[in-house]
């Protein structure tokens, strides 16, 4: 099935990513009314974000492609359409696309009154290679 975007492709992320990613803020919640942000992120093949934490946690709703999620010190989890990832507050993690496939998710950052993401070091090429392990993406 060809990729049929649900939301328009967002702006290219300028920082905190290795590779090309596009972010469309669906619910920026600038006023704080909802105490959460909702965003659509498209990762081009091989793209991943830096290690980071969220003071209020994060939820990922995987909508297209093949991706990976990894918590610091844990094995990576392969993600595909329909997967849901619940990330507790302050858990250091990264997520991104498979080496040869794009990946899209809806991200939800709850409890935004606690603050935004804390961005840490980039995921190294070695960490990424070990996490994705040349897996077959069928």
PLM feature segments, named:
Residues 1-35, 116-138:
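A short, N-terminal "cap"/entry segment at the start of jelly-roll beta-barrel domains
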Residues 21, 25, 33-34, 44-53, ...:
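Catalytic core of non-heme Fe(II) oxygenases with the double-stranded beta-helix
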Residues 38, 86, 100-119:
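A short hydrophobic beta-strand segment most commonly corresponding to one strand
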Residues 40-44, 53-69, 108-110:
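Short, conserved beta-strand element in jelly-roll/cupin
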Residues 73-90:
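Short acidic-glycine-tyrosine-enriched beta hairpin
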Residues 96-98:
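Asparagine-centered strand-capping/turn motif at beta-strand->loop junctions
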């Amino acid at each position: 099935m060809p990729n049929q975007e649900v939301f328009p492709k967002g702006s290219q992320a300028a920082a905190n990513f290795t590779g090309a990613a596009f972010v469309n803020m669906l619910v920026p919640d600038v006023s704080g009314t909802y105490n959460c942000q909702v965003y659509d992120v498209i990762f081009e093949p091989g793209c991943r974000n830096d290690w980071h934490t969220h003071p209020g946690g994060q939820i990922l709703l995987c909508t297209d492609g093949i991706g990976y999620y990894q918590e610091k010190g844990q094995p990576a989890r392969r993600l595909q359409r329909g997967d849901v990832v619940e990330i507790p507050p302050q858990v250091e993690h990264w997520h991104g696309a498979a080496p040869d496939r794009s990946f899209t998710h809806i991200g939800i950052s709850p409890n935004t009154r606690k603050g935004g993401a804390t961005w840490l070091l980039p995921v190294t090429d070695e960490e990424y290679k070990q996490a994705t392990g040349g897996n077959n993406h069928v």
